C-alpha cells in the first residue's frame, strides 16, 4: 500500500534513494519495484521494524540490481554526506516530530541539487476528526504532535530550500476505519465494527477488487486519509 505515485518521479540510473522513517519497509519495496537500478536505504529508530524490513528486502532483493540497506539513526542527524541522495521519501513521519523543521534542514542537506523530496502526512480534516473522537489517539507515546494544513505545509517546506511540484490524497477508505478505532479506542481490539471494517481494507489491499479501488479513487480528493506532496530541492 503506497502513499505516492512513483511514476511521477524519474531518477538517474544507479541513483540513491532514502526512505526516512521506513518502518517495516512498506515504501522500500515499492521503490525497489519502480527503480530497480537504484540503491535504496531505509532509516528508522525502531530496531524491530528495521529487522522486519530487512527480512522483507531479502525476499524482494531479486527485483533490484543495486541493492538495499538499512540503518538505525535519527532524522535530525543522519549519517550521510551532503548531497548523497537523488530522492528522499518521508511518509507519515513529520507529524510525529517535535522539531520537524530541523529534520527538513537535514533532508535538504543530504539531497543532491534538484533531488526530490516526497513527504506525506495525515490530511487535515480526517485527522481532526480522529483527535476529536479520542484524546488517547494523539496522546499516546510517539503519537502525532500536530495536524498539518496543506498550505501551511507547502509554505514551511518550501522555506527550507524546496520548490513545490504537486500534491494528491490517498487512502480514502482508511479514514472511516481510523474514526471507528478512535470512537471505540478502549475496545478497538475486540470491537466487531472495527473488525468488520478492517476486513474490508484487508480485502482491498490483498485482493484489489476493482470496485473498491474505484471507490477509493473517487473519494480520495475529499476523504483521503493521507496527503502526499512532491518537492524538488532548489
List PLM regions with ranges.
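Conserved SAM-binding loop
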Residues: 2-130, 229-232
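An amphipathic, basic-hydrophobic alpha-helix
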Residues: 3-8, 152-153, 207-216
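Active-site phosphate/pyrophosphate- and oxyanion-stabilizing loops and adjacent acidic/basic residues
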Residues: 29, 105, 151, 155, ...
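Short, hinge-like loop/turn segments at secondary-structure boundaries
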Residues: 58-60, 135-138, 182-186
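Short, glycine-/aromatic-enriched active-site segment of Class I SAM-dependent methyltransferases
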Residues: 122-144, 155-156
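A C-terminal cap/extension of S-adenosyl-L-methionine-dependent methyltransferases
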Residues: 132, 171-234
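Short aromatic/basic micro-patch
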Residues: 147
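Conserved S-adenosyl-L-methionine
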Residues: 162-172
